[in-house]
């Protein structure tokens, strides 16, 4: 069996050992999965695995164990591969079984040939996910993950690449591809392990730069093809996952080899139905889009490095929740003051911003998403600087965020909705392909007079559907397919927003800083990292807590609402009851209470009265209706 640390530096050797021991029993695959699961159970073990998010690809040893935190952007068609194959020694006729799992290329010695007709060959199926870094991931999240793994990754970065390092840009501009065979003199031959009729691992051209398909413009980081062998039905597009797998970056995966003979190829080119464009999309250069053969893959409940991976079950998570709930009142008070300063002294708007930040879709009743709380902050300065600075503040306390200026040009030119490209057989990403709990700030203060074209109208409609139904209708040309989402949408506007919202608060600044950018910068500078971490933990934890209402409180709320309708039948509607229930739920959670109390119900009513009174005091601002 491999040495203590060989499970990271040489995982295929571990697999080989288990395969040799257990192949006769047929349970070697389960033993491999159990082995790596056990290795990753320790508190420090996951951090000891080099992370592709932090370590440059050219510093990672090929065929070593790596991890990757990412979002599933697309799922390709399932593919067949040779899970077990038999080779024949051309000198001695000796036959040997090999495993093809966790590999793109079959390994064999120079004198060995794969027997394609062997009855002992086993054809298996695997799924390929196209994964990208979490869209809009906040810098503090990246820094926290990096600092937690950097010390332990250093030992793995001592690998010296056998080729000169090339940047992403240099890889995109490569010249004619090297088509030399991968099994030179003295090297073991490596054959592709995909079975006949399925995908080739060769693009038709090396000169065209592949589209890495990031949903948001300006995003950086690696995209990866994740080969998943078990349980792929439990994952879906837009899930955040953490993959532990074997890194495959062999140049043969992206080399053009038109002279592949029958001996060196396990694919029959005549059976290959892929178009050239599809080959480019599905088989990009491994130096740009490495492959990871998943050994263990976890779906992440959240992307907050300050929280335990799960809030259920472990003593560590129970202790964390207990400790944070003990100081939740103090943290809430400090966060309220922090956001009040960011909102120019408006404490009421800060109250609503807090409950917006911890809101989440916790269930769906038919098509209605329960728990969402889209906030429209009206009365914002028209120049857009305030909204962008507010976004920078929020980016410091939420794990993922994106700022979208709603200019006419952006609405008409940007692609919001992902669409299926049938020529390349891939899902082209759009701005609204975001992971759960992403904060999306829509800045309407920059919306000027102009004409929305057809694309612009579709984009506005998509935003409305996102806000109202928490879904995005992906474009599959011949039909639309609904993808449910869980996005916290904050709309800043001068007057009433053209988009729907669950609640609208009119901003009433209590101060007018002469230099707004300097003021916001000073606010962040004065906030200690330890305090910001408390805010981050507070927001992350409270949106994951369970909540309930007792029968007694339910009856009291019903009676109270009936009385409210009697006293003011003209202005109290069913929508008001729904909003009050949502606000009271979020107010309770923001105070660390997982059930509604009479006091919180009355507090919610008080906040709603204060919010509505602002619209009665001032009906018009700058000619726009409030």
Curated annotation (Swiss-Prot):
GO terms for molecular function: chromatin binding. The keyword Repeat does not apply. It is found in: Nucleus. GO terms for biological process: cell division; DNA-templated DNA replication; sister chromatid cohesion. Its main location: nucleus. Signal peptide: none annotated. It comes from the Eukaryota. GO terms for cellular component: nucleus. The keyword Transcription does not apply. InterPro entries: MCM_complex-bd. Residues 159-187 are annotated as: Disordered. Keywords: Cell cycle, Cell division, DNA replication, Mitosis, Nucleus. PANTHER family: MINI-CHROMOSOME MAINTENANCE COMPLEX-BINDING PROTEIN (PTHR13489:SF0). Interacts with the mcm complex: associates with the mcm3-7 complex which lacks mcm2, while it does not interact with the mcm complex when mcm2 is present (mcm2-7 complex). Interacts with mcm7. Associated component of the MCM complex that acts as a regulator of DNA replication. Binds to the MCM complex during late S phase and promotes the disassembly of the MCM complex from chromatin, thereby acting as a key regulator of pre-replication complex (pre-RC) unloading from replicated DNA. Can dissociate the mcm complex without addition of ATP; probably acts by destabilizing interactions of each individual subunits of the MCM complex. May also be required for sister chromatid cohesion. Belongs to the MCMBP family. This is Mini-chromosome maintenance complex-binding protein. It comes from Xenopus laevis.
């Amino acid at each position: 069996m491999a040495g203590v640390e060989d499970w990271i530096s040489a995982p295929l050797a571990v697999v080989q050992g288990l395969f040799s021991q257990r192949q006769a029993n047929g349970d070697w695959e389960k033993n491999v999965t159990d082995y790596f699961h056990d290795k990753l159970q320790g508190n420090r073990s996951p951090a000891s695995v080099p992370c592709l998010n932090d370590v440059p690809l050219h510093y990672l040893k090929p065929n070593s164990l790596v991890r990757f935190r990412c979002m599933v952007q697309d799922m390709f068609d399932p593919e067949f591969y040779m899970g077990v194959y038999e080779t024949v020694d051309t000198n001695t006729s000796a036959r040997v079984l090999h495993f093809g799992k966790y590999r793109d290329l079959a390994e064999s010695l120079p004198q060995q040939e794969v027997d394609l007709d062997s009855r002992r060959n086993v054809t298996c199926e695997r799924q390929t996910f196209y994964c990208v870094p979490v869209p809009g991931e906040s810098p503090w999240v990246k820094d926290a993950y990096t600092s937690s793994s950097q010390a332990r990754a250093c030992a793995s970065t001592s690998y010296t690449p056998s080729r000169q390092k090339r940047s992403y840009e240099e890889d995109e501009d490569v010249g004619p591809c090297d088509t030399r065979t991968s099994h030179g003199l003295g090297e073991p031959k490596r054959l592709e392990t995909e079975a006949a009729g399925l995908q080739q691992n060769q693009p038709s051209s090396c000169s065209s730069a592949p589209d890495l398909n990031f949903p948001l413009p300006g995003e950086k980081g690696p995209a990866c093809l994740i080969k998943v062998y078990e349980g792929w039905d439990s994952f879906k597009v837009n899930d955040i996952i953490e993959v532990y797998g074997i890194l495959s970056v062999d140049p043969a995966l992206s080399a053009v080899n038109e002279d592949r003979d029958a001996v060196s190829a396990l694919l029959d080119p005549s059976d290959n139905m892929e178009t050239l464009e599809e080959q480019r999309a599905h088989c990009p250069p491994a130096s740009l889009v490495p492959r990871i053969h998943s050994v263990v893959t976890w779906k992440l409940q959240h992307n907050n490095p300050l929280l335990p991976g799960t809030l259920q079950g472990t003593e560590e998570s129970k202790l964390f929740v207990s400790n944070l709930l003990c100081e939740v009142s103090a943290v809430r008070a400090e966060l309220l003051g922090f956001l009040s300063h960011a909102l120019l002294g408006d404490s009421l708007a800060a109250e609503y911003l807090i409950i917006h930040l911890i809101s989440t879709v916790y269930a769906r009743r038919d098509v209605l998403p329960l728990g969402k709380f889209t906030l429209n902050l009206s009365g914002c300065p028209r120049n857009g600087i305030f909204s962008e600075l507010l976004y920078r503040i929020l980016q410091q306390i939420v794990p993922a965020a994106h700022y979208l200026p709603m200019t006419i040009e952006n609405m008409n030119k940007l692609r919001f909705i992902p669409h299926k490209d049938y020529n390349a057989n891939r899902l082209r990403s759009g701005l609204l392909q975001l992971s759960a709990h992403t904060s999306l700030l829509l800045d309407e203060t920059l919306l000027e007079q102009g004409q929305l074209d057809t694309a612009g109208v579709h984009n506005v409609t998509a935003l409305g559907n996102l806000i109202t139904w928490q879904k995005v209708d992906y474009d599959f040309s011949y039909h639309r397919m609904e993808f449910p989402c869980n996005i916290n949408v904050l709309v800043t506007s001068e007057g009433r927003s053209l988009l729907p919202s669950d609640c609208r608060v009119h901003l009433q600044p209590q101060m007018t800083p002469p230099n707004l950018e300097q003021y916001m910068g000073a606010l962040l500078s004065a906030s200690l990292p330890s305090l910001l971490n408390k805010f981050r933990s507070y927001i992350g934890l409270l949106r994951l807590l369970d909540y309930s209402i007792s029968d007694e409180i339910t009856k009291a709320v019903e009676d109270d609402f009936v009385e409210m309708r009697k006293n003011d039948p003209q202005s109290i509607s069913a929508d008001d009851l729904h909003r009050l229930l949502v606000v009271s739920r979020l107010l309770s959670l923001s105070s660390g209470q997982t059930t509604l109390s009479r006091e919180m119900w009355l507090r919610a009513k008080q906040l709603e009265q204060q919010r509505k009174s602002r619209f009665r005091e001032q009906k018009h601002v700058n000619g726009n209706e409030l």
